[in-house]
Amino acid sequence: MTEITAEGNASTTTTVIDSKNGSVPKSPGKVLKRTVTEDLVTTFSSPAAWLLVIALIITWSAVAVVMFDLVDYKNFSASSIAKMGSDPLKLVHDAVEETTDWIYGFFSLLSDIISSDGDEEDDEGDEDTAKGEIEEPPLKRKDIHKEKIEKQEKPERKIPTKVVHKEKEKEKEKVKEKEKPEKKATHKEKLEKKEKPETKTVTKEEKKARTKEKIEEKTKKEVKGVKQEKVKQTVAKAKEVQKTPKPKEKESKETAAVSKQEQKDQYAFCRYMIDIFVHGDLKPGQSPAIPPPSPTEQASRPTPALPTPEEKEGEKKKAEKKVTTETKKKAEKEDAKKKSEKETDIDMKKKEPGKSPDTKPGTVKVTTQAATKKDEKKEDSKKAKKPAEEQPKGKKQEKKEKHEEPAKSTKKEHAAPSEKQAKAKIERKEEVSAASTKKAVPAKKEEKTTKTVEQETRKEKPGKISSVLKDKELTKEKEVKVPASLKEKGSETKKDEKTSKPEPQIKKEEKPGKEVKPKPPQPQIKKEEKPEQDIMKPEKTALHGKPEEKVLKQVKAVTTEKHVKPKPAKKAEHQEKEPPSIKTDKPKSTSKGMPEVTESGKKKIEKSEKEIKVPARRESHQLQNVTKAEKPARGSKEGFEDVPASKKAKEEAEEVSSTKKQKSPISFFQCVYLDGYNGYGFQFPVTPAQYPGESSGKPNSPGPKQ
């Protein structure tokens, strides 16, 4: 620590010299000595340096012993073992003495080194202090003299300024005199202010007394009103027992805190009213977030002396507000329910007479759809008693034809396509299931179309649609030739596809099948679908349950009305072209042959679905439903109405062979070669009758029948 003091002294001397302008004469040699000694002192002042020195000594001594064989290990070890064997205590004592000697010698060296350094430093420090004592007093004296001289000069300077500026001093005195009355005025104001707070305290006490009196009067009035309000609240509580209890507990806490504040603060009543307005509009499900009262208020509040009718009043007001809000909400919910029920009733009424649905996909629930379907099925069952009697006959005849076909199939060419048809049916099932899962994806796109479509459907009357459909059915009953009807439909479908309007054809065919359910031909369709094509059951159930079907129906309702008028004209032209000699021969081929052809059409549509986008898939599946449903229905109708029962047995055998020749290869070739067109290719309709290889088979097939 002596080194530190020496450093401190040196620093003080240098600072003194530097701080003063005078310089002390010193030799440069002494400065160099100081730097060397300071370096040594600073290095060895820390114990780490000494530890390093000791470590170096030990290591290098060991190196010297090993390198130069300074110790005779054998003799040393042998003598030590002999000593251990003879007198172990002596050996221990000798070792301890030797070690202590070494330790004492080492410490003595250290103390000598440190003491010698300290002595040198002390001598240098004493010299420095002596020089400082000699040097410093004259500097201090000079400072004192300078300060005294400066002080003397300053008053001398002030004296002439007084002589010169006497006028200014007079002016200052005048200003001071003016300021004195102002100060007196300020003193008076301060006194008045002191008196005013006293008056304020008095007025506050008076106001508190008045507010207490007012509160007591109000409480008396409120106690009377409370009895009337209790009667009202009991009625309200009977309705809302479950909702109110939680908020009321918290309200009681709020009102208790408010009543405590009223006794303390003069603005308590205002706070009370604000709290009522803030916390009063509590909804039944929500619990109000009540901020805890501040601890300072709690400490300052005395215990409530008055009874708490304010609490009751607050509870009643809040309960009344809750009752009103809840009744309003209930009334709004009931109105919304009534409106939704009215809308569903209106939609039901519109669907039954005109079948132009206006509902959006998602407003009406599935339960309402199920109810409408049940009503429509009841109407259909009433109107469809006569055709239902005719259906079992058609079923039996179709079964006979199906059994006779494998018996009379003589050629392998006709058998192979029938097997492929069966495979195609299986593929169709899988595709229909896959498409039904994918229908939910573009529902949003269809919703946009429904909004525009609904506006058009509301403008157009449902009566027009029903009258047009009646005309269609009359024309279709007249048509007995199956290939001609296929030509008509094929031509219509292809023309619509080429004009980039696939929707009209779908609507034409779906209108009689789905929307105009109450009319007599449709019950046949429903009942014949079940025995003839069991494949269609899962499809229809999946389609009816979804809102996408509504979208398609709405689009169809608009486009059919646009394309209704040209349709009968086309059919009339096709009827004129039909040869009359073949009419009586083919009514029954419809019952079995038609499903095959329609299945081929379905294969076309399903393969086109893969290339076209997802919305096209929905429309094509709708086509399949309708074509399967309508064509067998028409065929069975025509077969039972136009042809007498005596000719049926003879014609069955001829029809089986002719239908095999006509239809089974047609369906095969349609599957294979009509993939790439899909309405984008040819301008003219590509139907089975127009293929060059198969056109020869069609005129030949009716030949033997004539």
From Swiss-Prot:
GO terms classed as biological process: heart contraction; regulation of cardiac muscle cell membrane potential; regulation of release of sequestered calcium ion into cytosol by sarcoplasmic reticulum
Membrane topology designation: Single-pass type II membrane protein
Organism placement in taxonomy: Eukaryota, Metazoa, Chordata, Craniata, Vertebrata
Lumenal topological domain: 69-706
Cytoplasmic-facing ranges: 1-47
Region annotation Disordered: where it falls in the sequence: 1-28, 117-265, 281-663, 684-706
Species of provenance: Oryctolagus cuniculus
Subcellular location: Sarcoplasmic reticulum membrane
Expression sites (tissue/organ): Detected in skeletal muscle and in heart (at protein level). Detected in skeletal muscle and in heart.
Presence of keyword Transmembrane: yes
Glycan-modified residues: 75, 625
Name listed for the protein in its UniProt record: Triadin
Keyword NAD in annotation: no
Biased composition (Basic and acidic residues): 128-254, 309-358, 372-432, 443-518, 525-552, 570-588, 599-621, 628-651
